[in-house]
Amino acid sequence: DRDSCVDKSRCGKYGYYGQCDECCKKAGDRAGTCVYYKCKCNP
């Protein structure tokens, strides 16, 4: 789910992150981006 995406994500301070996207899509969201080293899912 969305929380596990954030917990597991390791990415750059800003920008697109493929694994984020995959995890977020499984959680039912459209895509994922990185904000301050954390994954954010976009509904």
Swiss-Prot record:
Subcellular location: Secreted
Tissue: Expressed by the venom gland.
Record's keyword terms, sorted: Disulfide bond, Ion channel impairing toxin, Knottin, Neurotoxin, Potassium channel impairing toxin, Secreted, Toxin, Voltage-gated potassium channel impairing toxin
PROSITE patterns: ERGTX
InterPro entries documented for this protein: Ergtoxin, Scorpion_toxin-like_sf
GO terms of molecular function: potassium channel inhibitor activity; toxin activity
Major localization class: secreted
One Gene Ontology cellular component annotation held by this UniProt entry: extracellular region
Disulphide connectivity of cysteines: 5-23, 11-34, 20-39, 24-41
Free-text note on domains in this protein's UniProt record: The presence of a 'disulfide through disulfide knot' structurally defines this protein as a knottin.
Protein name: Potassium channel toxin gamma-KTx 4.10
Species assigned in the record: Centruroides sculpturatus
